[in-house]
Regions:
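Proteolytic maturation boundary segments
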Residues: 1-67, 202-218
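M16 family metallopeptidases and their MPP-like homologs
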Residues: 50-82, 86-215
Length: 218
């Protein structure tokens, strides 16, 4: 009832409003500095971040065959959720929460503004942490990337089954977005990396035939 009650005009007039003159015409500048650290290209963004460092590692995956693209989604789901050399996956999650604001992985697709068929695709691993926690964050990222036990078939099945269930709910609640992305795959190669339907079909197949596929998957 409170929300449905109209606000008096005098109260509405108290709400701060922006005039067109308050808005800047100039686009915000980029603060990008390209560096090379031990032969690795680095882009540094020198902007105020309230003492928090945002770190993203990018790995080129343009060489991955089209039929293997859905497995990148499986890899993304597995990293951080399996045991590593020094931690169980539960203990690893605790360490991540203690020292960082999270570690995640995703697939980044960067289309060209000039050519719809020209794009770059990267496998990205991200974290954010306070500056004095950067060594711990980097160590945990290294632990996850290089020592994750992706041969744990029982855990792999659990992750695949859970991911399939979550994706099923997501498709049901956002079918229009899923259909839109699928339609884009017919004229945009870059859209294939975001195709939820193909990924879901792959998960269904992996879950149904896990015993036959588990060794190849790992």
């Amino acid at each position: 009832e409170y929300q449905e009650t109209p606000s008096p005009k005098e109260d509405l007039e108290k709400i701060p409003m922006l005039a067109r003159s308050d808005m800047k015409k100039e686009a915000a500048p980029f603060y990008n500095t390209e560096l090379s650290v031990k032969g690795i290209p680095v882009v540094h963004h020198d902007i105020y971040s309230n003492g928090i460092i945002y770190l993203t590692m990018l790995f080129d995956i343009a060489h991955v065959p089209a039929e293997d693209i859905p497995y990148l989604g499986v890899l993304k789901a597995v990293l951080g959720y399996v045991d590593t050399k020094n931690y169980s996956y539960a203990d690893f999650a605790n360490e991540v929460n203690i020292h960082t604001g999270g570690i995640s992985s995703t697939i980044g697709v960067y289309p060209s503004v000039k050519d719809k068929d020209d794009y770059q695709v990267k496998f990205e691993v991200r974290t954010k942490a306070l500056y004095d926690k950067l060594p711990e964050a980097a160590t945990l990222m290294k632990e996850m990337l290089f020592t994750s036990n992706i041969d744990d078939e029982k855990r792999l099945y659990e992750i695949i089954a859970e991911l399939k269930s979550r994706l099923q709910v997501s498709i049901s609640s956002a079918g229009h977005s899923v259909a839109s992305t699928r339609a884009m795959t017919y004229f945009s190669k870059a859209a294939a990396y975001k195709d939820t339907i193909t990924f879901y079909e792959t998960l269904c197949d992996l879950e149904a035939h896990f015993d036959e596929r588990r060794e190849a998957l790992a």
